[in-house]
Amino acid sequence: MARLILLRHGQSAWNLENRFTGWTDVDLSPAGEAEALAAARLIRDEGLDFSVCHTSMLTRAIRTLHLVQQELDRLWTPVRKHWRLNERHYGALQGLDKRETAARHGEDQVFVWRRSYDVPPPVIAPDDPKHPVHDPRYADVPPDVLPCGESLEATVARVLPYWYDAIAPDLMAGRDVLVAAHGNSLRALVMHLDGLDREDVSRLDIPTGLPRLYELDAALRPVSYRYLGDPAEAEERARAVAAQGRLEKN
């Protein structure tokens, strides 16, 4: 039976500041570093291991993975980095404070941008310096496939080819796999694994720094899945993700 661990990166500096991050390359906060180390201990306490790792091209996911590997004395484990595991691209929203954006555009509009399945955020132009076409880490990616703002639907379409081309073959070969990625790229994988529809995945929240363990049959269908650690903590962290972008009530 193959095992797959999905891990959202620890809290980032912009998670802490409640900003839309997307493809902006920010680092972990001190709390995020602690979450990554705690995730490693949860994996160790369950007696789990992994023989190959996958992550995105963004620092917060890469550093989360490295902290887990270091804590578990697994820095030698092969790692594959790929842009298809990057966070959803939030277009012109990247860098904006979520609550300030809600105050300006309304909570309902921000909810649609964040949680709807097929509505993209306002996009950025290809000549914008923040467009990924200008980032050297994507120099080998065809410019016409680099996003300028994505819906969750577009994120799913971007992520799933990597599942079929890289992650699934590792699992089919009998390797236990750790994927350290982002809230929306992981939502795409969970949607596929759990057979969620667009309404279900729109309500799905992935907490930072908590490993989600899947046990998969020979056809890579889930036999079981759960968050490691305290289920109440997983629910609390997921609620915190859902609350982002809401205005404070007086």
From Swiss-Prot:
Database matches in PROSITE patterns: PG_MUTASE (PS00175)
Stored PANTHER family: PHOSPHOGLYCERATE MUTASE
BP GO annotations: gluconeogenesis; glycolytic process
Family annotation (Pfam families): His_Phos_1
Binding site for substrate: 8-15, 21-22, 60, 87-90, 98, 114-115, 183-184
Record-linked InterPro entries: His_Pase_superF_clade-1, His_PPase_superfam, PG/BPGM_mutase_AS, Phosphogly_mut1
UniProt xrefs under SMART domains: PGAM (SM00855)
Catalyzed reactions per annotation: (2R)-2-phosphoglycerate = (2R)-3-phosphoglycerate
Gene3D superfamilies: Phosphoglycerate mutase-like
Coiled coil region boundaries: none
Group of enzyme by EC: isomerase
General function of this protein: Catalyzes the interconversion of 2-phosphoglycerate and 3-phosphoglycerate.
Source domain of life: Bacteria
Stated name of the protein: 2,3-bisphosphoglycerate-dependent phosphoglycerate mutase
Involved pathway(s): Carbohydrate degradation; glycolysis; pyruvate from D-glyceraldehyde 3-phosphate: step 3/5
Homology family: Belongs to the phosphoglycerate mutase family. BPG-dependent PGAM subfamily.
EC number: 5.4.2.11
Subunit structure, interactors included: Homodimer.
Natural source organism: Nitratidesulfovibrio vulgaris (strain ATCC 29579 / DSM 644 / CCUG 34227 / NCIMB 8303 / VKM B-1760 / Hildenborough) (Desulfovibrio vulgaris)
Site positions per UniProt: Transition state stabilizer: H182
Keyword annotations: Gluconeogenesis, Glycolysis, Isomerase
